[in-house]
Amino acid sequence: VLAALKTATSVRAASDKVLTDFERPADQSETVKIKRASYGQKYYDKYTKAGATTPSEGGNNMNDRQNFVNTAASYIGCKGSDGSHKKIIDIYNEHTPLARGYKVKYTDAWCATFVSAMAIKCGLTDIIPTECGCGQMIALFQKLGEWQENDAYTPQPGDVVFYDWDDSGSGDNTGWPDHVGIVETISGSTFKVIEGNMSNAVGRRTMTVNGKNIRG
């Protein structure tokens, strides 16, 4: 990837190269390419201004990711059993427009709602779409050109990861996603995720990089 980026003559060229050669989403239309490149252009414009820092030097991109992770971690321990998860649901429901016009109930499954609520709290809804359903959220990521299904990809802190618990482990995991979380840390072949609705609470889980249950 780095070699491809170094030879690119523009943000658009670099974005298109990564999209077509590495991410390879089903939808590689011009609309998707333009939208994907616009995110890179935004950061390029920001970090090439005088006095700005690059993401690798601790600029806003890395700060946004860490803030997203830290915000999620601050809710660890919230549970459905004592009603403390209601504040998470409320954050989601107070954001407009509601995805598909649906107001989440306190008794609904709330893993995608949790991720969405953290994005709302951090002001990241332009790059992390809000949804209360995992499958629908994946569709929105695909529409934004942000969906990553490359087995060689190593998760980064702040990434949103989806699982299909019913996958057999034979072939690529393409089943319906059951759950979603936020990547907190990576250590060798494993990574730690913060999840909402993990046994009806916000908690941490350790996953294997490119494990059979990873949907994307």
Write out the residue ranges for each language-model feature.
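N-terminal capping segments
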Residues: 53-124
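Soluble non-cytosolic domains of exported or imported proteins
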Residues: 8-12, 30-34, 62-66, 105-113, ...
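Non-catalytic cell-wall polysaccharide-engagement segments
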Residues: 2-65, 211-216
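Sec-exported extracytoplasmic/periplasmic mature domains
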Residues: 1, 19-24, 45-49, 73-81, ...
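...with weaker cross-activation on analogous glycine-rich loops/strands in unrelated enzymes
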Residues: 6, 125-200
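Aromatic- and glycine-rich peptidoglycan recognition patches
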Residues: 45-49, 53-63, 67-70, 77, ...
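Residues within well-formed alpha-helices
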Residues: 13-14, 35, 39, 71, ...
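Short clusters of hydrophobic/aromatic residues that line enzyme substrate/ligand-binding pockets
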Residues: 5, 88, 202
